């Protein structure tokens, strides 16, 4: 479009130069005009006006096209603004409801947790204790977890560690007698809403997911991490869709390494560029 605009301006300039050149020569040098008239006959005026007319007509067509294109662009921008406004109205309403959902989750854990956890943060701290106890008492589980420390972990060992850790979370929740499953479902739906609404627009997805992430404590992010790899993180088709959403969009990138049960667990989310990774570790993050 910029090229067409430049062409139009150049043609206007050329037509103007032709017109003023003829006027200037007519006034300054009658002999030159006489020679031109001898060559072109009596039609020099028609020739010049016809040439200028064609140029200006072409220029007018270009400007009409540019005007139409500008109107289309303005119309698209207006639609995009309306689209974003509608989305943000729904999104921020859902985000405000999230606080109520989290509060209800804390109440449920406080009421039913057998370890006496008063909220989700304490529920996660108890899970860390449960993990350490299992590491110390179950050699097979300890071996599976230690495999994650290997630089080039085999696929079979990776899958075993992922399965065993997810199973451990399931066992912990069962032992506690509560999970606040509605909290995880709500977070899942909120994240899914953003991803599906802005499909293919990574920057927009990242912007709005950051709004959600910023409202969560480290312990909540930790619960999302391990809940997503457990049986409770599967969808109706037994697929780990929630984990995929979290990993593909680096939702957990700002979780601290101290929050994870083990630093090596970052390998369970191979596409996430965690903030605590060193330069060598960042090089192997899958895109």
Language model regions located:
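Extended alpha-helical segments
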Residues: 39-108
């Amino acid at each position: 479009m910029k090229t067409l605009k430049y062409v139009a301006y150049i043609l206007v300039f050329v037509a103007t130069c032709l017109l003023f050149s003829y006027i200037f020569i007519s006034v300054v040098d009658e002999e030159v005009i006489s020679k031109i008239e001898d060559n072109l006959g009596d039609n020099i005026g028609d020739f010049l006006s016809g040439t200028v007319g064609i140029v200006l007509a072409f220029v007018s067509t270009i400007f009409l096209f540019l005007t139409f294109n500008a109107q289309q662009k303005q119309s698209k921008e207006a639609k995009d603004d309306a689209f974003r406004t509608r989305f943000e109205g729904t999104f921020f309403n859902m985000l405000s409801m999230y606080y109520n959902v989290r509060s209800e989750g804390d109440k449920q854990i406080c009421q039913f947790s057998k370890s006496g956890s008063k909220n989700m943060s304490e529920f996660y701290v108890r899970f860390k204790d449960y993990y350490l106890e299992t590491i110390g008492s179950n050699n097979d589980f300890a071996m599976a977890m230690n495999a994650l420390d290997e630089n080039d972990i085999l696929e079979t060992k990776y899958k075993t560690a992922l399965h065993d850790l997810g199973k451990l979370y399931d066992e912990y929740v069962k032992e506690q007698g509560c999970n606040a499953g509605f909290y995880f479902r709500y977070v899942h739906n909120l994240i899914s809403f953003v991803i599906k609404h802005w499909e293919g627009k990574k920057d927009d997805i990242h912007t709005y997911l950051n709004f959600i992430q910023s409202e969560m404590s480290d312990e909540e992010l930790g619960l999302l991490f391990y809940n997503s790899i457990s049986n409770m993180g599967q969808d109706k088709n037994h697929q780990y869709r929630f984990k995929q959403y979290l990993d593909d969009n680096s939702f957990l990138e700002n979780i601290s390494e101290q929050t994870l049960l083990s630093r090596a667990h970052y390998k369970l989310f191979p596409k996430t560029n965690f903030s605590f990774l060193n330069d060598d570790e960042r090089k192997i993050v899958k895109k």
